[in-house]
Amino acid sequence: MRVAVAGCCHGELDKIYETLALAERRGSGPVDLLLCCGDFQAVRNEADLRCMAVPPKYRHMQTFYRYYSGEKKAPVLTIFIGGNHEASNHLQELPYGGWVAPNIYYLGLAGVVKYRGVRIGGISGIFKSHDYRKGHFECPPYNSSTIRSIYHVRNIEVYKLKQLKQPVHIFLSHDWPRNIYHYGNKKQLLKTKSFFRQEVENSTLGSPAASELLEHLQPAYWFSAHLHVKFAALMQHQATDKDQAGKETKFLALDKCLPHRDFLQVLEIEHDPSAPEYLEYDVEWLTVLRATDDLINVTGGLWNMPEDNGLHTRWDYSATEETMKEVMEKLNHDPKVPCNFTMTAACYDPSKPQTQVKLVHRINPQTTEFCAQLGITDINVMIQKAREEEHHQCGEYEQQGDPGTEESEEDRSEYNTDTSALSSINPDEIMLDEEEEEEEEEEEAVSAHSDMNTPSVEPASDQASDLSTSFSDIRNLPSSMFVSSDDASRSPASGEGKCGETVESGDEKDLAKFPLKRLSDEHEPEQRKKIKRRNQAIYAAVDDGDASAE
């Protein structure tokens, strides 16, 4: 089947589907499935904008709300994962995945589904070592800390995925697996993104958690985004059986949805012709969810996953034939994902913009139904109960704060390299911290009742026309799923045949009209930069430490 893969979407669904339609007309047939690698931005209304980790002036409504309201419908089944710039309150409603709009499916914090016999897995968010071993404790209203930590990958999601034994065909992650750049054209990558050089040479660019999953799952395809550059690699895994050759993983990262950027690629993927043409639950994955239900943690404390070290009575949560049969019985022997999308929040109305927004922690009926059918815990219900207990003990709700990130030597993450302190800056991005310092008077912790001047949410009609024209300039480029590396000893063969067609889009003049985002591998310095305040003379007597951003 023909599968389209998109990099960072940034809410530009109209442009992506328009580009896809043009690719279909110029290509060799209709596309069966669209996979999006994060920064999807399923923004329904102004409250959702408030929960997206970008500076206020870069918050734009974009076009998802039209698909949420039913005004438009996705022309092709769309599956996506979360990145580091999302409507976090919306996605939090669906920790196990679900429909965010008709024909648009979110994989959840981590998840695996099947479509036409193809097994598709993914993990949302990005890696940040000091949050990796925490539970999922965040909930709206977010503050300046939790609005970021909520999209950081947690060890429990990686642990669940590592229980899988059956082959995974396609896997999605937002940030790249660490070291994957050594298996592609590293020289060309550094020519395009020279500011990656230090991390590439030190092997610190990318996610060690994703790298661990790549080594364990060894999928046929791995797609990522996040770094805003197209890059392909071919990784040869070591054989586990002497009589069989090691598996190969074709890696492809794509750019963001902007004119003249390689943000979309169409591939031919083998599938099972006898498999149903609708989305199905993956029984092995559901079995793992049931087995690991007792491991759910909704606190900010650091904790380790069970392992075979003599300290745990159980460390193997993989599925067995018997436990998978139990899951099939709970599904009534029908693994079809129900089309049970329901609106849980008001949709943005351009004619009636809301200046007052209220951030609410919602329980989504899709998640309620899913958990009831499988007999597992709704994480959001668990979080709400924890807050109620806190309210009962303290007599009042307290402002949610960062529960502390200081660690002792023995409590450190198993990944001792934190990319947050790296100094390289992507000039294609905007540093969130810098912008927050610059907008010091405007920024405040996200609150349940907050005034908000909604940014311009729709382009002017002439701008929209220009953008439509620019995004229609598509060319089929030579495939880069197979590339020659500058490291000859580790390079994939360059003589492979064509595997896909790249879709690029057009006019460079509109680049400045799109919101930028920071690079988050994450390049947040541990000690934030000190800046000069706008009216420095007024603050001449203030201690120097007060002039730095908090």
From Swiss-Prot:
Binding site residues for a divalent metal cation 1: 8, 10, 228
EC number: 3.1.4.-
Chain segments carrying region Lariat recognition loop: 124-154
Protein's cellular compartments: Nucleus
Cofactors demanded by this protein: Fe(2+); Zn(2+); Mn(2+)
Biased composition (Polar residues): 416-426, 450-483
Bias (Basic and acidic residues): 498-528
InterPro entries in the record: Calcineurin-like_PHP_ApaH, DBR1_C, Dbr1_N, Metallo-depent_PP-like
Any one Gene Ontology BP term: mRNA splicing, via spliceosome
Residues annotated as transmembrane: none
Highest taxon of the lineage: Eukaryota
Major site of localization recorded for this protein: nucleus
Biased composition (Acidic residues): 430-445
Annotated disulfide bonds: none
Keywords attached to this entry: Acetylation, Hydrolase, Iron, Manganese, Metal-binding, mRNA processing, Nucleus, Phosphoprotein, Zinc
Keyword field contains Hydrolase: yes
Residues that coordinate or bind a divalent metal cation 2: 39, 84, 174, 226
GO molecular function: metal ion binding; RNA lariat debranching enzyme activity
Inhibition and activation profile: Active in presence of diverse metals including Fe(2+), Zn(2+), Mn(2+). Also activated by Ca(2+). Binds two metal cations in two adjacent alpha and beta metal-binding pockets.
Residues recorded with modification N6-acetyllysine: 128
Renumbered residue ranges of the record's region Disordered: 390-550
Residues annotated with Phosphoserine modification: 28, 470, 480, 484-485, 489, 491, 494, 505, 520
GO CC aspect terms: nucleoplasm; nucleus
Role: Cleaves the 2'-5' phosphodiester linkage at the branch point of excised lariat intron RNA and converts them into linear molecules that can be subsequently degraded, thereby facilitating ribonucleotide turnover. Linked to its role in pre-mRNA processing mechanism, may also participate in retrovirus replication and have an antiviral cell-intrinsic defense function.
Similarity section: Belongs to the lariat debranching enzyme family.
Protein name: Lariat debranching enzyme
Gene: Dbr1
